[in-house]
Every structure is written in C-alpha cells, then in structure tokens.
Amino acid sequence: METAVDKLEAMFQKAEADMEYMEKRLRLDFLTNVPENSAAEENPMKLLENLSAIKTRHAALCTQVQEIAAEQKQSMDAIRVHLDTTVQLVQQLQQTADVELPTVTETEQESAEFLGLSVNQNTIEVPMSMELPAQELPQSSREGEFEEVSEATLEAVPCSMRANVKLANLNAFYKQLHEYFSFRKNSGALSLPKMKQMNMKVSDAKLKTLQHLSLIELDMKGHVRLLL
C-alpha cells in the first residue's frame, strides 16, 4: 500500500513538471507566431489561461495525495504499535497459563512478515527494536493498576484523532476515570454531563484517543466505561 501511494505521488509530480514545461513552450511559441491584435477567439493565449486553471487543480490533487500518504503512514505505525502490544499480551498469557497456542496460519504468517515481525511455530515474535517497555503496555495488562499513557504511545495515535491533546492533560483525565471506576467496581457507564459535573476535563479528542488505545469503551450514546 505504501509503494502504491509513493508511485501515485511520483506520477503527479512528473505530470506537474510536464505541464510546467508545456506552458512555457506554448507561451514562447504563441508570443513569437501570433499577432498581438488577433481576435480573442483566435488567440491561442487564451488556451494558456485554461492551462493555468488545470495546473491549479492539479496542484490541489498533489496536496491531497501527500496528505493521504501522511495519514497512511500514521495508520501503519498505529497498527504496528497495537499489534506489538497484542503479541506481548498473548505471549505473557501463554507463559502464565502454560497454554499451548495453535500453530500460526499461513495468512497470519504473511501478515506478520508484511509488518516486519518474525514468526515461530506457535507465536509471532516482536523484534527487539519494536518491543514496547513495560510502562507502555495498555492499562488492561497491568491488573487494574493505573499506568500513564507514554509519549510514544500517544504519538502513535493518528493526528486527526488526537488533535492537539497534551500528554499531561490526557493522563490527568485518564487518571480521573481510573479512580472513579476503581472505587465503583459495579458502576454503570459515565455520561458526558456527569463527567462535567464531576469537574473532569473531558474533551472529544481525549475520549477518541483513549478509545483508540483500547483504554475506554464508548457506547452509541457517548457514555464511557473504563476497560480495566
């Protein structure tokens, strides 16, 4: 997918260069061969105005391609981070419960190789350079103990989702949620008005970020439940 986006971006850049050259060549030929007092409908210079409009639209498309490439890279990084975490949790579960997992399927092996992960007979292994420190594991792996979101984990969340959320503010809000649900084991989901009533610094970006990190659960009404 990354290669396809790169090729598309290169094609747009080449097309832009070709149009630039064509415009300069046509402008020179028209200025040399067409009288200045020729009729407007017969004057090829009008074609250059249309070409300029086409170039403007083409430049806008190039910008969109670059934005798509950036978002695609962020999405791939986020997928790798979450897959790394899942693999580590599965390995920890296997070691703790002494359970033998099913053999990795051919499809799973191809997916792991595509993401740069090594595969043995039963599990997908995370390369050392991609392993997450213990403090970066999601809260669900820490047996109910509060663990702050790390800067690396936050940066793995797509910019379109986390917006301008600050790490300190996100952790402060997450801690408020954790303390509330820790003391109220059987309490229902929290509504937005209830959170504001409790002076929680809630925002849509914070909720989406924590949901993306699988730390909270949001229902259709926007009610929040902590995933302990």
Swiss-Prot record:
GO terms for molecular function: microtubule binding. GO terms for cellular component: cytoplasm; meiotic spindle; outer kinetochore; spindle microtubule. InterPro entries: Ska2, Ska2_N. It comes from the Eukaryota. Keywords: Cell cycle, Cell division, Centromere, Chromosome, Cytoplasm, Cytoskeleton, Kinetochore, Microtubule, Mitosis. One of its GO terms (biological process) is mitotic sister chromatid segregation. Belongs to the SKA2 family. Component of the SKA complex, composed of ska1, ska2 and ska3. This is SKA complex subunit 2. The gene is ska2.
